[in-house]
Each structure stands twice: as structure tokens, then as C-alpha cells.
């Protein structure tokens, strides 16, 4: 373990076996529901949209909806074809197809909320031939068409490794492409059945290979060869959770894998058990250890790292990307 990491047990503790355990002081938040919270909820309900804030029981919903007036929209329905052990989203076989009105409804919500940075995620849709890639592209295009100044961040599933799915979403020009690694390789079978560590890492690596920062793309003077792979502008991002039973050494190895894949932006947060049916919390990670993980990530070369007990994938997402100009 890196010398920069605090020793396990120094300020952290594990919940009692068989219980959800009492949360430590650093995870207790004050609940408030200002008017902006109700405005966001009314808008989401009116347009019949889903948000990961609600479906995944995000602890930051009151901060994002109430204080910042932001939300992460979840497209492609509210039923996921996979059953991850940490996720509160309903799993099963989706009964509905893709809503053709959803792209415009999401764009309307983004415009009404005045978002400068919109985050779009989805359930897994393994029942669709392209995993939902084309629908992602349509949502991105609808937002850009309606509000050109808004940056779009997408948090996608792995599309089951379907060929060309990545190009479909990247061709729609999202400002940020994100796919979460979630946890260390050893815990994938219990935490992410249906997903593979190597497949997720390969998706990030391929996206990083295709994506080029805007400045780099603009200054490239090399001629483009016939049949060359397309390259796009944008940034690449991922996130992991801790507290599922991983060891700090495994976290450091995973961070090295992620950075080696070319990822620039990283989030690290505490796993919170959504219901007693989900995986138990193995331990509560102390804020000092989160700070140490962040320091290690920056030393590896990540451009940005949000690391803390309540950090989630889209937490302060707008702060990681330079605002678009009108």
C-alpha cells in the first residue's frame, strides 16, 4: 500500500455483520427541500422523464435539485436488464421499447432548467441490438440542436461490446464520454454480474483513443488517410466505489489500469447499501483515505479527481469541463 494512504481502521469502521450499520458522522446530511427542488421534480414528472437521482436513491439529490437546480437524466426507461448488487434501479425485462419523444423531452428539460452542463445516463438495455447507442446519440443531438451552448456528458453502459456502438455515440459529439468501472476486478462477479472488468476497461481505452481534446484536434496538421478511423473531440471519465470489500492495494491497481487506458477524469465515492437486499457495506472509508486516493490519482496523471464519501458519478460534473461559448 502506498505510504500516502492511511492505515485501514484509522478512523474508519465496519458495520455490524448482518446489518446495514449506523452511518458515521461524515455521511450524515441535512435534508432540506427548497422551492427549486420541487420545481425540478415537477418538471421531471410533467415530461415523464426518469432521473438516476431518484431511481438510484442518490444521497445528493437535495443538494443538486435544491441548491443547484441540476439533475442527471436516465434514458431508455427505468428497467435495467442487469442486476448489479449495489444498484437500486429496478431490474428485469423491459416491457416498453424506446420512447421516440424522449430526446426532445430531455432537451426541453435541459433548456427549462438553464443547464450549462447536462448529464445523461441510462439503464442497461441488452435487449436492444445496439444497446441503446443510437438513442443516446439522438438525445445528445437534440440537446445540442436546442441549446448549442450546453455541454453534454454521457454515462453509458458497455453496450455488450457491440461493434460500432461507440462510434455512434461519439459521432454525436458529447463533450464528455463516461463509463463507470465501479469496483476492483476481484469483486466484479458479485457486484456486476453480466459485466466484465476487461470489457469496461477496453471500452474506456477505445474511447480515449478516439477522443481528442479540442485544442489538439484543431492544431493537428497531419493529413487524414483514406479509411482512417474517425476521431472526435471530448474528454473521458469513469468512477469507482469503495467500501464493497476491496483492499486499498486493489484500488491503487485499478486506478493505474484506468489511467493507463487514457481516462482523464475520475470520481471515487463511498458505497451505500440502498436496501437490505443489496450487497452490504464492508466498511466506511474515512475522508482522509478519500483524500489520499485523490492525491494518488493526481500523481498518476488524472486531470481531475473528485474523491469523497458522498461523491457520485455526476457530482460537480460541470466543474471538470471548460464551459462552452455561445
Where are these regions (language model features)?
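Auxiliary Fe-S-binding modules of radical SAM enzymes
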Residues: 1-71, 104, 108, 138-149, ...
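Glycine/Thr-rich phosphate-binding loops of Rossmann-like dinucleotide-binding domains
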Residues: 83, 128, 187, 276, ...
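Core AdoMet radical
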Residues: 88-106, 111-208, 237, 265-267
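Local cysteine-cluster metal-coordination motifs and their immediate loop/turn environment
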Residues: 52-64, 78-91
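A secondary-structure boundary/capping signal
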Residues: 54, 75-76, 121, 155, ...
Amino acid at each position: 500500500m502506498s505510504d500516502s494512504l492511511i492505515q485501514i481502521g484509522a478512523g474508519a469502521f465496519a458495520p455490524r455483520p448482518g446489518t446495514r450499520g449506523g452511518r458515521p458522522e461524515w455521511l450524515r446530511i441535512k435534508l432540506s427541500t427548497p422551492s427549486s427542488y420541487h420545481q425540478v421534480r415537477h418538471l421531471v414528472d410533467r415530461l415523464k422523464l426518469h432521473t438516476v437521482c431518484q431511481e438510484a436513491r442518490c444521497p445528493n439529490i437535495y443538494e443538486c435539485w435544491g441548491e443547484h437546480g441540476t439533475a442527471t437524466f436516465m434514458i431508455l426507461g427505468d428497467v435495467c436488464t442487469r442486476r448489479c448488487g449495489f444498484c437500486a434501479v429496478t431490474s428485469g425485462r423491459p416491457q416498453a421499447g424506446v420512447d421516440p419523444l424522449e430526446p426532445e423531452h430531455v432537451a426541453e428539460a435541459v433548456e427549462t432548467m438553464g443547464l450549462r452542463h447536462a448529464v445523461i445516463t441510462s439503464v442497461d438495455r441488452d435487449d436492444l441490438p445496439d444497446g441503446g447507442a443510437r438513442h443516446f446519440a439522438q438525445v445528445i443531438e437534440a440537446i445540442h440542436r436546442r441549446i448549442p451552448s450546453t455541454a453534454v456528458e454521457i454515462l453509458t453502459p458497455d453496450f455488450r461490446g457491440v461493434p460500432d456502438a461507440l462510434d455512434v455515440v461519439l459521432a454525436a459529439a458529447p463533450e464528455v464520454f463516461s463509463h463507470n468501472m465501479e469496483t476492483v476486478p476481484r469483486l466484479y462477479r458479485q457486484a456486476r454480474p453480466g459485466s466484465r472488468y476487461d470489457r469496461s476497461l477496453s471500452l474506456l481505452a477505445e474511447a480515449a483513443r478516439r477522443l481528442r481534446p479540442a485544442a489538439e484536434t484543431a492544431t493537428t496538421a497531419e493529413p487524414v488517410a483514406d479509411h482512417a478511423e474517425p476521431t472526435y473531440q471530448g474528454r473521458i471519465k469513469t468512477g469507482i466505489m469503495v467500501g464493497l470489500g476491496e483492499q486499498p492495494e486493489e484500488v491503487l491497481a485499478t486506478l493505474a489500469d484506468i489511467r493507463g487506458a487514457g481516462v482523464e477524469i475520475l470520481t471515487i465515492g463511498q458505497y451505500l447499501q440502498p436496501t437490505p437486499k443489496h450487497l452490504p457495506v464492508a466498511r466506511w472509508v474515512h475522508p482522509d483515505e478519500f483524500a489520499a486516493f485523490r492525491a494518488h490519482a493526481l500523481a498518476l496523471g488524472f486531470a481531475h479527481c473528485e474523491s469523497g464519501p458522498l461523491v457520485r458519478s455526476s457530482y460537480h460534473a460541470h466543474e471538470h469541463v471548460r464551459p462552452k461559448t455561445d
